[in-house]
């Protein structure tokens, strides 16, 4: 790649200029606030170096909300461009860049970290653990994700964004058709963030299998913990495929290899297969934790034990197996034989069976329950019909012959948004509101929360339901404009109105966070909603102390905390207090991730010397870690008593 210094910063577009100015002003404002209030030491010692799973979860969620804003703005710009025929709001290249970054950010840098953030906050509490199995690795996982996300996101102001679509199909992603650093940003940003996700998968799989409290057998685990365990197993098997695929495509672009080009025996379809062998399990990586969140919320606010617990566990395991057997349905039209298409058509339809089982589990859980229509419960109730719409249209797409009509039309776009927004995004909002007191010590305002729910949910349906009909009328996806005689104007305009309603809903959520911080009553009890059934609500305060439990609880049944309340069990008798071992904070994961970022940035522009320097930094941090003998520290019984006394006051 012949790099030109006058092309280092992206110029010539007022939208990009506005973004550059806002980034500069925001950075200056953050530095000023931290300096003025003397918070640099606090930021370093309490957050950047923390190994506390709860704080890392909050950092994941904050990052995900920022990415939701960035990806949402991309989506609104796309809808603004398509609102009217022959619109010139965006040119074709800018639209392709936004289309690419929107999909990548929402899947990789918003949905996954949001769910991983909730997992970090909740799962160790649900299994009665003090922290995760590998706290140091947990910090490293976050910072590699964050650095990968930042590397990807600076592309739109430095060098130029990727524009080959979020799937980066070859040969479109080759140097010939996508010159410049944009596609390199995609490959290296995802690679670095993917390393962090793989480490998270290993960490939480070990945590759940090895660190459950006394009496918590696998079949007594909360459903959110079960879905997390299965999700982590999928991550461990799926993400190495993505890692290898990204590495091979990087070799094609950076070093002239031919893994995915027809020259020298390469095969473009190899990329499509590798991408979707990871890509479809990825769908279940972001949907299974959502199922767990809805299970916790529905069971809690229906005040009933989850119906069909064993069937629920079996269906989750079945989905995890089938998720690796359906990837070819993403390219039924690309020349596979009839027998291959038939096999993957059958497996795709089969995966709807265990998914359907869970729908009935939730419905029967609510049957004859004393339901409280809180904001989290409203999101859970909205999820069921909207997700079913997405699922039914998914079965339609699973029919290989019919897919020749639906493929690459807006019918498909509507389908996966009904699955991913109604499934994953609704769950992120529901879980965020449900466990908000566990993170910040107070609830979000219910009245404002319900305004957010209704505006966003109605806007979602106004935006995406018309797209089914646009697809049936032949509107292809990924086009940046259309003619007035195509007959798509009215439905596209309606869809755009719905998209901006969703944007208004997001702003209401942000206002709710501010309003609740100022005016909400601070929670005293660890059971903030009064309907808690699992151990995450059994803590002695709304925000758990850093050691989580003064005495590790003993579990005797499913819904352990619910039964403890019924039996009036004393949770934390002082006679059982013992000194608690906790891990020490460390700044090395941060520096190692920065080194990853330096290496990635250098390789984006093919400055190999910078790439080597960055990788040497990574190796140096690993060597220093191997000579580290810090085994953590102990919290004395007196300190535990003092902490618990302050909590109870």
Curated annotation (Swiss-Prot):
CDD domains linked: Ubiquinol_Oxidase_I
Subcellular location, record wording: Cell membrane
TM region positions: 14-34, 56-76, 105-125, 140-160, 188-208, 229-249, 274-294, 306-326, 343-363, 377-397, 416-436, 452-472, 493-513, 586-603, 607-624
Top EC category: oxidoreductase
Pfam families: COX1
Catalytic activity, as annotated: 2 a quinol + O2 = 2 a quinone + 2 H2O
EC code: 1.10.3.-
GO molecular function: copper ion binding; cytochrome-c oxidase activity; heme binding; oxidoreductase activity, acting on diphenols and related substances as donors, oxygen as acceptor
Main subcellular location: membrane
Primary role: Catalyzes quinol oxidation with the concomitant reduction of oxygen to water. Major component for energy conversion during vegetative growth.
Protein name: Quinol oxidase subunit 1
């Amino acid at each position: 790649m012949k790099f030109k210094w006058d092309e280092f910063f992206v110029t010539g577009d007022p939208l990009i200029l506005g973004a550059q100015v806002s980034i500069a002003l925001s950075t200056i404002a953050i530095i000023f606030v931290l300096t003025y209030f003397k918070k640099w030491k606090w930021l370093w010692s309490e957050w950047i170096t923390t190994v506390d799973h709860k704080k890392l979860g909050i950092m994941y969620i904050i990052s995900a909300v920022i990415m939701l804003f960035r990806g949402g703005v991309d989506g609104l710009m796309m809808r603004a461009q398509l609102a009217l025929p022959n619109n010139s709001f965006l040119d074709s290249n800018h639209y392709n860049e936004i289309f690419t970054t929107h999909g990548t950010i929402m899947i990789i840098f918003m949905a996954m970290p949001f769910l991983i953030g909730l997992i970090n906050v909740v799962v160790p509490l649900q299994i009665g653990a003090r922290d995760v199995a590998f706290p140091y690795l947990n910090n490293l996982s976050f910072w590699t994700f964050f650095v990968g996300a930042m590397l990807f996101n600076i592309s739109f102001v430095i060098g130029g964004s990727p524009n080959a679509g979020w799937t980066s199909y070859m040969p479109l992603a080759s140097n010939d058709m996508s010159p410049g650093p944009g596609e390199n940003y995609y490959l290296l940003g995802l690679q670095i963030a993917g390393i962090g996700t793989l480490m998270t998968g290993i960490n939480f799989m070990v945590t759940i299998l090895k660190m459950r409290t006394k009496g918590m057998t696998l079949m007594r685990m909360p459903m959110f913990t079960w879905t997390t365990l299965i999700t982590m197993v999928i991550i461990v098997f799926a993400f190495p495929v993505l890692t290898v695929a990204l590495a091979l495509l990087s070799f094609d672009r950076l070093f002239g290899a031919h893994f995915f080009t027809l020259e020298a025996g390469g095969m473009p379809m190899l990329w499509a297969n590798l991408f979707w062998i990871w890509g479809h399990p990825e769908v279940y990586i972001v949907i299974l934790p959502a199922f767990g969140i809805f299970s916790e919320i529905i069971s809690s606010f229906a005040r009933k034990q989850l119906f069909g617990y064993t069937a629920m566990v079996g269906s989750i395991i079945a989905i995890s197996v089938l998720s690796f057997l359906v990837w070819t349905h993403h390219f039924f039209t690309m020349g596979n034989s009839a027998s291959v298409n038939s096999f993957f058509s059958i497996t795709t339809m089969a995966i709807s069976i265990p998914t359907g089982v869970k729908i009935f589990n939730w419905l029967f859980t609510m049957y004859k329950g004393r339901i409280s229509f809180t904001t989290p419960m409203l999101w859970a109730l909205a999820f069921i019909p909207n997700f079913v719409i997405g699922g039914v249209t998914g079965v339609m797409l699973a029919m290989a012959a019919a897919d020749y009509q639906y493929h690459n039309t807006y019918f498909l776009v509507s389908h996966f948004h009904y699955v991913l927004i109604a499934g994953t995004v609704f769950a992120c909002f529901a879980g965020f509101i449900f466990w908000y007191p566990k993170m910040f010590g107070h609830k979000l305002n219910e009245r404002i929360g319900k305004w957010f729910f209704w505006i966003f949910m109605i806007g979602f349906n106004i935006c995406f339901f018309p797209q089914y009909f646009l697809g049936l009328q032949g509107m292809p996806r990924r086009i940046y404009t259309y003619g007035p005689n195509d007959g798509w104007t009215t439905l596209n305009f309606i869809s755009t109105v719905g998209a901006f309603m969703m944007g208004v809903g997001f702003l209401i959520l942000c206002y709710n966070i501010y309003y609740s911080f100022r005016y909400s009553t601070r929670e005293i009890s660890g059971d903030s909603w009064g309907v808690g059934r699992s151990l995450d609500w059994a803590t002695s305060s709304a925000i758990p102390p850093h050691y989580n439990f003064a005495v590790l609880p003993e579990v005797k049944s499913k819904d352990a905390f619910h039964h403890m309340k019924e039996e009036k069990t004393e949770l934390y008798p002082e006679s059982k207090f013992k000194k608690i071992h906790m891990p020490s904070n460390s700044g090395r994961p941060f520096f190692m991730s920065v080194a990853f970022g330096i290496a990635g940035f250098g390789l984006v522009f093919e400055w190999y010397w910078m790439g080597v320097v960055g990788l040497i930094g990574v190796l140096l941090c690993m060597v220093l870690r191997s000579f580290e003998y810090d085994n953590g520290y102990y919290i004395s019984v007196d300190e535990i008593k003092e902490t618990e006394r302050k909590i109870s006051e």
